[in-house]
From Swiss-Prot:
Main subcellular localisation: secreted
Tagged with keyword DNA repair: no
Source organism superkingdom: Eukaryota
Tissue specificity field: Expressed by the skin glands.
BP GO annotations: defense response to bacterium; defense response to fungus; innate immune response; killing of cells of another organism
Subcellular location, record wording: Secreted; Target cell membrane
Keyword Secreted: yes
Residue numbers bearing the Leucine amide modification: L60
Keywords for the protein's UniProt record, in alphabetical order: Amidation, Amphibian defense peptide, Antibiotic, Antimicrobial, Cleavage on pair of basic residues, Fungicide, Immunity, Innate immunity, Membrane, Secreted, Signal, Target cell membrane, Target membrane
Role: Antimicrobial peptide with amphipathic alpha-helical structure that acts against both Gram-positive and Gram-negative bacteria and the fungus Candida albicans. Is active against S.aureus ATCC 25923 (MIC=2.5 ug/ml), S.suis 2 CVCC 606 (MIC=15.6 ug/ml), Salmonella ATCC 20020 (MIC=15.6 ug/ml), P.aeruginosa ATCC 227853 (MIC=60 ug/ml), and C.albicans ATCC10231 (MIC=31.25 ug/ml). Is not active against B.subtilis ADB403, E.coli ATCC 25922, and K.pneumoniae ATCC 700603. Also shows a strong antitumor activity, but no hemolytic activity.
Protein name: Temporin-La
InterPro entries in the record: Frog_antimicrobial_propeptide (IPR004275)
Propeptide stretches in the record: 23-47
Length: 62
């Protein structure tokens, strides 16, 4: 019974953290919408480029 409670508590905790990150991301997106649309596109491209570079470094090595 205890391992089951422990697992459920862990899932609840991780779900809460994930929800918190989603809310923060949504708040950031709402702030970006108030800015110039062209500026927002540049910010999104920079974020995307950063993730692509990390993935390429992971597979190709440094």
């Amino acid at each position: 019974m205890f391992p089951l409670k422990k697992s459920l508590l862990l899932l609840f905790f991780l779900g809460t953290i994930n929800l918190s990150f989603c809310e923060e991301e949504r708040d950031v997106d709402q702030d970006e919408r108030r800015d110039d649309p062209g500026e927002r596109n540049v910010q999104v491209e920079k974020r995307l480029l950063r993730h692509v570079v990390k993935i390429l470094e992971k597979y190709l090595g440094k």
